[in-house]
Amino acid sequence: MPEIYVAGTPVAGSPVAGTPVGAQTIAAQPGSNLLDVLLEHGHKVPWSCRSGQCQSCLVQARPDEVPSAAQAQLNAEQQSKGWLLACQCQLQQDMHISLHNPATDDLPARISDMRYLADDILLLRVTPERPLRFRAGQHMVLWLDATLARPYSIASLPGEGDLEFHLRLHPHGAFSNAIRERKTGDTLYMGAAAGHFHYDPGWQETPLLLLGSGTGLAPLQAIARDALQAGHEAPIVLWHWSRSQAQCYLADALSELADQHSQLSLHLRTHAELASDLTQLRLASRKTLALLCGQPAFVEQLRKPLFMAGLPGRQILDEAFISRP
């Protein structure tokens, strides 16, 4: 039976480095999932997608103890340091685990702007302590303290200075309530940018079909702007569904962008119109690439209509996260 030696859990509510408390030895069943084991034993490891895409559940182990599958989606530097994704780790041997501590493992950033884009959507801009590399549409984990973190898509482009995020706020959410109490000048911590969901310069002559709901618009509009800035030549069609016509929180900015770029066309719709809209999807070309962003149920709802419209699975990229408040 594998044993997990957990070095300790950072103190909840503390944003600064210190000696972790609660060192623990856990006996686990062979083949059990490391994330599940840690959560069951009271360790507050952030998680979202459980597929390895969001990279929220990073923990560290001795490099020779890490199953290769638990590192497959990480970069070479992370792998060499023993970082792994707990959700992708099936336990087969003893492991020595250190939990992620944002104050020592991540990049500090100062909040430069906070304002509402809609009743429940907060624009958050932050200034990183130093420049960092990312692609428009990728995501990163934002930490408010040593145990409270969520992944968010980057809504800004490289070169725009501050990083921008669009946060859906939940009435009784732990992260939502905590971020409401923050103010400009406060510090949070940012993980590394991650994810395959971004514009590729090799797509210049490929028609793009961007489909999103809610704050899934954040990475999609960034990808559209990045493509246009890169001189994208083929059509870009952006569909967005919100709870009401007034809920497309970027309607004015997107309309202005479409006025400036003839290859960009917009369809800003409501959730009530989604089923009907999907029956009318048309592809500009068999070479079209579709990018989908939203809740898992929304992403799955789009797959069959896209297939029926003639789009093979290899031409569909998606970013689907389980929304955790």
Question: Language model features by range: what are they?
Answer:
Residues 9-23:
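Intrinsically disordered, low-complexity terminal tails and inter-domain linkers enriched
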Residues 22-32:
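Short, contiguous acidic and Ser/Thr-rich linear segments
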Residues 91, 101-103, 146-148, 192-197:
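Short, charged beta-turn/beta-strand-edge "cap" motif at the junction between a beta-strand
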Residues 105-187, 242-244:
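Ferredoxin-reductase
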Residues 161, 166-325:
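FNR/FR-type flavoprotein reductase catalytic core
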